[in-house]
Protein backbone atom coordinates (compact mmCIF):
# COMPACT_ATOMS: atom_id res chain seq x y z
CA UNK A 1 0.00 0.00 0.00
CA UNK A 2 1.28 3.49 -0.88
CA UNK A 3 0.49 6.75 0.87
CA UNK A 4 1.21 9.98 -0.96
CA UNK A 5 2.56 12.85 1.10
CA UNK A 6 3.84 16.01 -0.58
CA UNK A 7 3.71 14.04 -3.86
CA UNK A 8 6.20 11.51 -2.48
CA UNK A 9 5.10 7.88 -2.07
CA UNK A 10 5.58 6.08 1.23
CA UNK A 11 5.09 2.33 1.29
CA UNK A 12 3.04 0.98 4.20
CA UNK A 13 2.81 -2.72 5.04
CA UNK A 14 2.03 -4.89 8.08
CA UNK A 15 4.94 -5.50 10.40
CA UNK A 16 6.27 -9.07 10.35
CA UNK A 17 8.77 -10.85 12.56
CA UNK A 18 11.87 -12.68 11.34
CA UNK A 19 9.88 -15.89 10.85
CA UNK A 20 7.32 -14.09 8.69
CA UNK A 21 4.63 -14.08 11.36
CA UNK A 22 2.32 -11.07 11.36
CA UNK A 23 1.37 -9.94 14.88
CA UNK A 24 -1.92 -8.17 15.48
CA UNK A 25 -0.22 -4.79 15.69
CA UNK A 26 2.53 -2.82 14.00
CA UNK A 27 3.15 -1.08 10.69
CA UNK A 28 6.26 -0.83 8.50
CA UNK A 29 6.87 2.44 6.62
CA UNK A 30 9.47 2.62 3.84
CA UNK A 31 10.44 5.53 1.58
CA UNK A 32 9.29 5.61 -2.01
CA UNK A 33 12.39 7.40 -3.24
CA UNK A 34 16.10 7.37 -2.32
CA UNK A 35 17.25 9.88 0.26
CA UNK A 36 13.80 10.62 1.68
CA UNK A 37 14.14 11.96 5.24
CA UNK A 38 11.98 10.91 8.17
CA UNK A 39 11.25 14.58 8.81
CA UNK A 40 9.33 14.84 5.52
CA UNK A 41 6.51 12.78 7.05
CA UNK A 42 3.95 14.88 8.96
CA UNK A 43 4.26 14.19 12.68
CA UNK A 44 0.50 14.35 13.31
CA UNK A 45 -0.11 11.78 10.58
CA UNK A 46 2.44 9.48 12.21
CA UNK A 47 0.84 9.99 15.62
CA UNK A 48 -2.50 8.91 14.20
CA UNK A 49 -0.93 5.79 12.73
CA UNK A 50 0.82 5.04 16.03
CA UNK A 51 -2.45 5.31 17.95
CA UNK A 52 -4.13 2.93 15.48
CA UNK A 53 -1.32 0.40 14.98
CA UNK A 54 0.57 0.94 18.29
CA UNK A 55 4.02 0.34 16.78
CA UNK A 56 5.61 1.99 13.74
CA UNK A 57 8.90 1.00 12.14
CA UNK A 58 10.32 3.60 9.76
CA UNK A 59 13.11 1.87 7.83
CA UNK A 60 15.28 3.04 4.96
CA UNK A 61 14.81 6.76 5.56
CA UNK A 62 17.57 9.29 6.09
CA UNK A 63 17.48 10.10 9.78
CA UNK A 64 19.30 12.14 12.43
CA UNK A 65 22.88 13.35 12.68
CA UNK A 66 22.87 13.73 16.46
CA UNK A 67 20.75 13.79 19.62
CA UNK A 68 19.85 17.46 19.14
CA UNK A 69 18.45 16.74 15.67
CA UNK A 70 16.33 13.90 17.08
CA UNK A 71 15.03 16.15 19.86
CA UNK A 72 14.01 18.89 17.43
CA UNK A 73 12.14 16.31 15.36
CA UNK A 74 10.33 14.93 18.41
CA UNK A 75 9.02 18.38 19.38
CA UNK A 76 6.72 18.12 16.35
CA UNK A 77 5.00 15.16 18.01
CA UNK A 78 4.09 17.03 21.17
CA UNK A 79 5.61 17.95 24.49
CA UNK A 80 8.92 16.17 25.00
CA UNK A 81 9.36 14.66 28.46
CA UNK A 82 12.49 15.99 30.14
CA UNK A 83 14.68 13.99 32.52
CA UNK A 84 17.53 15.30 34.69
CA UNK A 85 19.86 14.26 31.84
CA UNK A 86 17.71 16.01 29.20
CA UNK A 87 15.36 14.74 26.51
CA UNK A 88 17.46 11.91 25.04
CA UNK A 89 18.46 8.73 26.85
CA UNK A 90 21.55 7.13 25.31
CA UNK A 91 20.92 3.39 25.49
CA UNK A 92 24.37 1.92 25.23
CA UNK A 93 26.21 -0.60 27.38
CA UNK A 94 28.24 0.96 30.19
CA UNK A 95 31.23 -0.61 31.88
CA UNK A 96 30.44 -1.38 35.53
CA UNK A 97 26.74 -0.65 35.00
CA UNK A 98 24.71 -0.26 38.19
CA UNK A 99 21.38 -0.92 36.47
CA UNK A 100 20.20 -3.54 33.97
CA UNK A 101 19.16 -0.80 31.51
CA UNK A 102 22.84 0.04 30.94
CA UNK A 103 24.16 -3.52 31.08
CA UNK A 104 23.86 -6.18 28.40
CA UNK A 105 21.22 -8.07 30.43
CA UNK A 106 17.79 -8.89 29.11
CA UNK A 107 15.09 -6.46 30.27
CA UNK A 108 11.68 -7.97 31.15
CA UNK A 109 8.44 -6.51 29.83
CA UNK A 110 7.32 -3.24 31.44
CA UNK A 111 5.87 0.15 30.60
CA UNK A 112 7.81 3.40 30.86
CA UNK A 113 6.94 6.01 33.46
CA UNK A 114 5.46 3.58 35.96
CA UNK A 115 7.60 5.11 38.73
CA UNK A 116 7.33 8.74 37.59
CA UNK A 117 4.86 11.59 38.13
CA UNK A 118 3.78 11.44 34.48
CA UNK A 119 3.51 8.54 32.03
CA UNK A 120 4.58 9.22 28.41
CA UNK A 121 2.26 8.30 25.58
CA UNK A 122 4.99 7.45 23.08
CA UNK A 123 8.59 6.31 22.96
CA UNK A 124 10.64 7.32 19.94
CA UNK A 125 13.72 5.13 19.39
CA UNK A 126 16.48 5.94 16.90
CA UNK A 127 19.11 3.30 16.17
CA UNK A 128 22.53 4.96 15.96
CA UNK A 129 24.48 1.68 15.72
CA UNK A 130 22.94 -1.74 15.29
CA UNK A 131 24.41 -4.91 16.80
CA UNK A 132 25.34 -7.77 14.51
CA UNK A 133 22.71 -10.35 13.63
CA UNK A 134 24.31 -12.87 16.00
CA UNK A 135 24.78 -10.37 18.86
CA UNK A 136 21.21 -10.39 20.20
CA UNK A 137 19.76 -7.23 21.67
CA UNK A 138 16.39 -7.19 19.97
CA UNK A 139 13.86 -4.82 21.53
CA UNK A 140 10.65 -6.67 22.38
CA UNK A 141 7.11 -5.33 22.19
CA UNK A 142 3.88 -6.97 23.35
CA UNK A 143 0.37 -5.80 22.53
CA UNK A 144 -1.73 -5.97 25.67
CA UNK A 145 -5.09 -5.83 23.81
CA UNK A 146 -3.93 -8.78 21.69
CA UNK A 147 -2.89 -10.68 24.83
CA UNK A 148 -6.33 -10.06 26.34
CA UNK A 149 -7.93 -11.47 23.19
CA UNK A 150 -5.74 -14.58 23.39
CA UNK A 151 -6.50 -15.34 27.05
CA UNK A 152 -9.10 -17.94 27.96
CA UNK A 153 -11.92 -17.25 30.42
CA UNK A 154 -10.12 -18.68 33.46
CA UNK A 155 -6.99 -16.65 32.70
CA UNK A 156 -9.04 -13.48 32.30
CA UNK A 157 -10.79 -14.11 35.61
CA UNK A 158 -7.44 -14.51 37.37
CA UNK A 159 -5.96 -11.41 35.74
CA UNK A 160 -8.98 -9.27 36.65
CA UNK A 161 -8.58 -10.17 40.31
CA UNK A 162 -4.85 -9.52 40.43
CA UNK A 163 -2.90 -6.32 40.94
CA UNK A 164 0.82 -5.69 41.13
CA UNK A 165 2.86 -3.68 43.59
CA UNK A 166 6.35 -2.67 42.50
CA UNK A 167 9.24 -0.77 44.04
CA UNK A 168 12.43 0.35 42.37
CA UNK A 169 15.41 2.60 43.01
CA UNK A 170 17.46 3.86 40.06
CA UNK A 171 19.71 6.78 39.22
CA UNK A 172 16.90 9.31 38.77
CA UNK A 173 14.09 8.02 41.02
CA UNK A 174 13.13 5.80 43.95
CA UNK A 175 9.43 5.05 43.88
CA UNK A 176 6.57 2.65 44.49
CA UNK A 177 3.81 1.84 42.02
CA UNK A 178 0.62 -0.23 42.23
CA UNK A 179 -1.59 -1.17 39.27
CA UNK A 180 -4.35 -3.66 38.50
CA UNK A 181 -3.24 -6.16 35.89
CA UNK A 182 -6.31 -5.36 33.77
CA UNK A 183 -7.55 -1.80 33.48
CA UNK A 184 -8.87 0.74 30.98
CA UNK A 185 -6.69 2.74 28.64
CA UNK A 186 -6.37 6.11 30.41
CA UNK A 187 -7.60 8.12 27.41
CA UNK A 188 -9.37 5.70 25.05
CA UNK A 189 -11.25 3.36 27.41
CA UNK A 190 -10.47 -0.03 25.81
CA UNK A 191 -8.98 -2.69 28.15
CA UNK A 192 -5.21 -2.98 28.50
CA UNK A 193 -2.72 -4.77 30.75
CA UNK A 194 -0.34 -3.00 33.13
CA UNK A 195 2.20 -5.65 34.10
CA UNK A 196 5.84 -5.37 35.08
CA UNK A 197 7.40 -8.75 34.40
CA UNK A 198 9.83 -10.09 37.02
CA UNK A 199 13.27 -11.28 35.90
CA UNK A 200 13.97 -14.99 35.70
CA UNK A 201 13.60 -16.39 39.20
CA UNK A 202 16.93 -16.96 40.91
CA UNK A 203 18.93 -14.98 38.34
CA UNK A 204 21.61 -13.41 40.53
CA UNK A 205 23.25 -11.76 37.51
CA UNK A 206 20.28 -9.43 36.93
CA UNK A 207 21.34 -5.95 38.06
CA UNK A 208 19.09 -3.85 40.32
CA UNK A 209 15.74 -5.62 39.96
CA UNK A 210 12.47 -4.13 41.17
CA UNK A 211 10.56 -5.63 44.08
CA UNK A 212 7.40 -7.48 43.00
CA UNK A 213 4.23 -8.34 44.94
CA UNK A 214 0.85 -9.49 43.64
CA UNK A 215 -2.41 -8.86 45.50
CA UNK A 216 -5.95 -10.12 44.98
CA UNK A 217 -4.89 -13.73 44.44
CA UNK A 218 -3.75 -16.56 46.70
CA UNK A 219 0.03 -16.87 47.14
CA UNK A 220 0.01 -20.24 45.40
CA UNK A 221 -1.58 -18.63 42.31
CA UNK A 222 1.41 -16.36 41.66
CA UNK A 223 3.07 -18.90 39.37
CA UNK A 224 -0.15 -19.44 37.44
CA UNK A 225 -0.60 -15.67 37.05
CA UNK A 226 2.90 -15.13 35.69
CA UNK A 227 2.81 -18.18 33.40
CA UNK A 228 -0.54 -17.24 31.87
CA UNK A 229 0.51 -13.63 31.29
CA UNK A 230 3.73 -14.74 29.65
CA UNK A 231 1.91 -17.29 27.49
CA UNK A 232 -0.30 -14.60 26.00
CA UNK A 233 2.14 -11.67 25.94
CA UNK A 234 4.80 -13.76 24.15
CA UNK A 235 2.37 -15.38 21.72
CA UNK A 236 3.42 -14.61 18.11
CA UNK A 237 0.15 -12.75 17.52
CA UNK A 238 0.82 -10.44 20.48
CA UNK A 239 4.62 -10.20 20.46
CA UNK A 240 7.22 -8.70 18.15
CA UNK A 241 11.01 -8.79 18.65
CA UNK A 242 12.72 -6.07 16.63
CA UNK A 243 16.20 -6.63 15.21
CA UNK A 244 17.72 -3.22 14.73
CA UNK A 245 19.33 -1.76 11.63
CA UNK A 246 21.21 1.51 11.80
CA UNK A 247 18.90 4.52 11.32
CA UNK A 248 15.73 2.57 12.11
CA UNK A 249 13.17 4.80 13.78
CA UNK A 250 10.55 3.13 15.98
CA UNK A 251 7.53 4.89 17.48
CA UNK A 252 5.81 2.87 20.22
CA UNK A 253 2.50 3.39 22.03
CA UNK A 254 3.57 3.21 25.67
CA UNK A 255 -0.03 3.34 26.97
CA UNK A 256 -1.02 0.17 25.12
CA UNK A 257 2.13 -1.92 24.68
CA UNK A 258 4.70 -3.38 27.03
CA UNK A 259 8.32 -3.55 25.94
CA UNK A 260 11.63 -5.11 26.96
CA UNK A 261 14.96 -6.23 25.55
CA UNK A 262 16.78 -9.45 24.81
CA UNK A 263 20.30 -9.88 26.19
CA UNK A 264 23.13 -9.00 23.84
CA UNK A 265 26.82 -9.76 23.45
CA UNK A 266 29.16 -7.82 25.72
CA UNK A 267 30.58 -4.79 23.90
CA UNK A 268 28.36 -5.34 20.87
CA UNK A 269 27.90 -2.08 18.92
CA UNK A 270 24.33 -1.50 20.11
CA UNK A 271 23.43 2.18 20.51
CA UNK A 272 19.87 3.48 20.64
CA UNK A 273 18.54 6.91 21.51
CA UNK A 274 15.15 7.20 23.20
CA UNK A 275 12.82 10.17 23.63
CA UNK A 276 9.54 10.20 25.55
CA UNK A 277 6.55 12.16 24.24
CA UNK A 278 3.83 13.29 26.66
CA UNK A 279 0.15 12.62 26.08
CA UNK A 280 -2.09 15.62 25.41
CA UNK A 281 -2.54 16.83 28.11
CA UNK A 282 0.27 15.12 30.02
CA UNK A 283 -0.93 12.02 31.86
CA UNK A 284 -0.51 12.16 35.63
CA UNK A 285 0.56 8.70 36.79
CA UNK A 286 -2.48 7.04 38.41
CA UNK A 287 -0.37 4.20 39.83
CA UNK A 288 2.38 6.09 41.63
CA UNK A 289 2.21 5.64 45.40
CA UNK A 290 2.52 9.18 46.70
CA UNK A 291 3.35 9.58 50.39
UniProtKB/Swiss-Prot annotation:
EC number: 1.14.20.9
Gene3D superfamilies found in the cross-reference section: Clavaminate synthase-like (3.60.130.10)
Pfam family, one: TauD
Residue numbers binding Fe cation: 110, 112, 259
InterPro entries: AlphaKG_dependent_hydroxylases, TauD-like_sf, TauD/TfdA-like
Disruption outcome: Disruption of the gene maintains the ability of the strain to produce the pyoverdine siderophore. Deletion mutant is more sensitive to chloramphenicol and ciprofloxacin in comparison with its parent strain. This sensitivity is probably due to transcriptional repression of mexT and mexEF-oprN genes. Exogenous addition of paerucumarin resumes the expression of mexT and mexEF-oprN genes as well as resistance against chloramphenicol and ciprofloxacin.
Record's catalysed reaction(s): (2S)-3-(4-hydroxyphenyl)-2-isocyanopropanoate + 2-oxoglutarate + O2 = (2E)-3-(4-hydroxyphenyl)-2-isocyanoprop-2-enoate + succinate + CO2 + H2O
Family: Belongs to the TfdA dioxygenase family.
Role, per record: Involved in the biosynthesis of paerucumarin, a cyclized isocyano derivative of tyrosine. Catalyzes the 2-oxoglutarate-dependent oxidation of tyrosine isonitrile.
The protein, known as: Tyrosine isonitrile desaturase
Annotated organism of origin: Pseudomonas aeruginosa (strain ATCC 15692 / DSM 22644 / CIP 104116 / JCM 14847 / LMG 12228 / 1C / PRS 101 / PAO1)
